[in-house]
Structures are given as C-alpha cells and as structure tokens.
Amino acid sequence: MRTTFLLLCFATSISAQTWRFAVAGDSRNCGDVVMPAIAAGAKADHAAFYWHLGDFRALYKLDEDMVREAKTPFTILSYQSAAWPDFIRYQLQPFAPIPIFLGIGNHEMVQHTRGDYVMQFGDWLTRPEIVRQRLADDANDHVVRPYYHWIQGGVDFITMDNASQDMFDFPQVAWVRRILARDAADPQVKTVVVGMHAALPHSLGCDHSMNESAQGEYSGSRVYQELLRFRETSNKKVYVLASHSHFLVRDAYDSAYWRAHGGVLPGIIIGTAGAIRYRLPDTTQGFPPERAQTDVYGYLMGIVDPDGTITFDFHEIGRSAIPADIVARYGADGVDWCFNENKDTTSHLSSVCAAADAPAGPAQRP
C-alpha cells in the first residue's frame, strides 16, 4: 500500500510540472551540420525527448554534408549504403542521452521500402514507451510499424506515416480513430499532439502536402475531421505538427478551406533541421516573421503546462551555434555554404493549391 501511495504521489508531482520536448523535421542536405547544434540546444533546454518528423537524408542525390566530409568520392551504391548510418552517427548520437522518436518521411522511401526502414531504425521504433503502449492497446499486437504512439505527461503523441502517396491507408485511419476514442475516455490524457511528415490537406502549405495525391487528400481530410470531432466532443486540446516543407509556418491550418469546412486546428510546419530551404508560399504573404519565415534552421520547443496547454517556441540555430568540432569536420566554408547557399528558389503558388482542391482531384505535378 505504501509503495502504491508513493508511486501515485510521484505521478501526480510529474503531471503537475511544466515540461519540455523538442521537435523538427527535414535534416537532409546539411543536417550533419545543423542537427548537432539542435541536440546541444535541446539539452540546454532540458527537453524530455526529440521528435524527428522525417527526411533524414536526400537519397535521390548526394547530401552536400556527406560529400564535404567524404575521404573518397561516393558512388551511387556507396552513398546509398552509407546514408542512414551517417544519419545515425552524426545526427542522432549527439542527442544522447535524450530519447529520440522518429517519423518516416518521403525521402526514406527513395530506393527503400518500409521494411527497410523498420529494419534500420528498429531500435528507435521499439523504444520501451512505444512497445508498452502498443501492447497496452492490444496485447496481441506484435507488429512493428512506422506509425505508433505513446503517452507521456498527460499528452498522447501520435506519429503517423504519410511518407508515400498511398497513405494514409485504411488500417492507419482506423488505428488513429481507436486511439482518439480511448483518449477521449481517458481522464489522464489532456492533450493530443499528432506529428507527421507532410502536412494534412488544405493547409497554408498545401502545394507540398497531402494534397499531392487523391488518397492523401481524402484520407488526410478524414483524419483532420476526426481530430476536429475529438476536440469538440472531449474538450481536450489538439495540436498538429508536420515538416516536408522546409520553412516555418505557424497556424498552418488557418486557411480559407478549413475556416469554411469545420474549423481550424492549431498546427505548425517545421521543416528546418538542415534541408535545403524553400521559398514561403504566397498564402503567407504579409505574415510577420514570427508566423512565417524561411532561410532559417532550428526547432520547436514544446512547453507543456500542467493543464495540457502546449506553447511552441521556435529556437533558431544560427551560424555561431554550430559546435567547433562540426566546423572542423566540414570546414568553415562548408558550414558557410549551408547557411548562405542551401536554398531552393522555386516559387510555391496558391494556384497549385486551388487546383489540388478542385472537385476533379489533386493536380498532377511534374
């Protein structure tokens, strides 16, 4: 009885405290330069964990940081075999001992399958928190998947898989519906945070999102509506995080479409962990820098209050934050390239979003 009482007191004290976690996605191209600085920031901020929303390495081309560090030139085969181990060594290991949770991005599917992903990253997909939650949901479920969830500090963190245009599939949609039903009935769960690679459809970044395929638009809209329904019926908090687009956009679902079709969920696009920086979409024209900015690296620090409210602060990683050993490894000119030249000047236009929203279905892109 005394042991039970002490455990209850400990759980109560933890749930009554403010705590933090770090999250960002898209660390290809220059992630080996940027991610160690994110790791240092997460440690300094006392983050309980780091959540990576996908796209670890480019895979369709050579990552510039790997080319810079290589002692001999890569072949296609040698690069492909080295890319994921490079990510683990240079991007994940600096976080130790902070736990890391991984989400799958579309670049993880380049020359690979989900089976390859599960084999390479099984150590992270079978973290005790994940396995314990999977078996609590279904004692007979012994399948390791790219999508999973875990409950921590009164928050259900749901990692979804939309890394290919056939996602979400029906089993994954059914799975998230079951989770939300349990969360609605669980008084210990105050908040749901859904993380994924591509943003759900009809966001301010919809030209590079689940709008890009018919299945993505249909299934992503279903999940969005399920989250709206969960929030309305349970009076619990919901936040949606994504990356895929390599910039920062807050209030990403405060779009004309969702204002007219059910409501706006709090959402942030945070694809700023080292990938080539995209131009902001014209849907963000006139936004202040705190709401939309590009040509920056950094991460979100989620600050969880005792009532389940989460405040997301953007922590920018500047050139001066890159650790000295990283500068020595890649050279000052290599680090400077990541900050000055790692940019894509392609425009992101709302006319493409309008085509995607048309009754005929999403537009085909070259």
Report residues per predicted region.
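Sec-dependent N-terminal signal peptides
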Residues: 3-12
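N-terminal active-site segment of His-dependent metallophosphoesterases
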Residues: 16-78, 365
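A general structural motif
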Residues: 18, 46-47, 97, 187-191, ...
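Residue-level marker for buried hydrophobic side chains located in beta-strands
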Residues: 21-23, 50-52, 102-103, 194, ...
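Active-site glycine-centered loops adjacent to acidic/histidine catalytic or metal-binding residues
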Residues: 26, 54-55, 105-106, 197, ...
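Extended active-site neighborhood of metal-dependent phosphoesterases/phosphodiesterases
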Residues: 64-188, 209-239, 245-293, 298-303
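Short acidic, glycine-rich surface-loop motifs adjacent to enzyme active sites
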Residues: 183-208
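Binuclear metal-dependent phosphoesterase catalytic core
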Residues: 248-361, 365
